[in-house]
Amino acid sequence: MPRIPNGITTDGFSFYRWWQKGKQYVWDKIIRQIFLGDSDIDPNRFFFFGISEGAYGSQRLASFYADYLAGVGPIAGGEPLVNAPSENSANIAFCLGTGSLDDSYGRNALTAAAKADFERLQAAHPGYYDHKIDVVEGAYHGTANLLYYDTIPWLINKTRKTNPKYVYWERLEQDGIYRRGFYNLYIPETEKPTERRCYEMTITGNTVDIKVNKVSYTATAWEDKHGMPIAYDKTYTSVSGGKLGIFLGNELVDLTKEVTVNINGKQAWKGIPELKIENLVNSCALYYDPYRLYPAYVEVDL
């Protein structure tokens, strides 16, 4: 798309952001057409790229739609991480480049913050959080020869990781919309949440371990030019209440054997999952993804 959305302003609010509700409806339709349509597009080589405003959008959308993506390439951007949690990008390739002299809206400082965050996460989770994030020395916002030419060569051979056995989902809101599914996880309740929850799933053999916490943010550092927060402390607290659905296929566990689901270290379900056509139908209707047609489904109380 060669331009930002129309910048109509109503009641002091501008509608030219790529992550806003009206654009999400379009993204959802595009994703469905790509993943279930007759196009020649490989659903495992689907990327978001963007420059400037498009960089903000692609970084946000990467965190929101990571389960559909092979990778993302924001250029000359930098989004506050409260809007685009790095944790959600565990299974995609993430490439971000911003000039060291690009200080408007804290772009250089926010890019440096993202680099530090991805390095922290990659060290804690080897094999995940594949990234190339650079604050390019001497580059301004529009220094094309220094910023633009590394992104596609680095991403070109990346492919989507389907059915990963480690998933982190910080279920954030984008313009009033919450996704109800992410990778193989599903939120049965339809009402909007009153808190931001994090779901961290690790599958080992036939054991599914899931940590569920509430997260809150406290800004700890600000950039000088505009006073925008660039660093946060995250506080996690245990939660109770609600339900969580887990779709399962043979890509994730051995469905002929007993499966154990633990929530925050306590056994929440154990048994041999029933294989039902309705689970295939429901997972297709939820994800619109040929690689996520799951015959088994388990729902647990939190």
Model-identified regions with their sequence ranges:
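Conserved alpha/beta-hydrolase
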Residues: 1-10
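N-terminal low-complexity, intrinsically disordered tails enriched in Ser/Pro/Gly
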Residues: 53-54, 76
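Short, flexible/disordered intra-domain loops and linkers
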Residues: 11-19, 104-111, 222-223, 233-235
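Gly/Ser-rich "nucleophile elbow"/oxyanion-hole loop immediately N-terminal to the catalytic nucleophile
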Residues: 13-52, 63-68
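Alpha/beta-hydrolase-fold serine-hydrolase catalytic core, especially in secreted/extracellular enzymes
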Residues: 120-302
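Hydrolases whose catalytic domains are alpha/beta-hydrolase-1, hotdog thioesterase
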Residues: 57-61
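The feature captures the conserved acid-bearing segment of alpha/beta-hydrolase catalytic domains
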Residues: 71-156
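Short, solvent-exposed turn/loop segments enriched in Gly/Ser/Thr/Pro and often Arg
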Residues: 6, 52-53
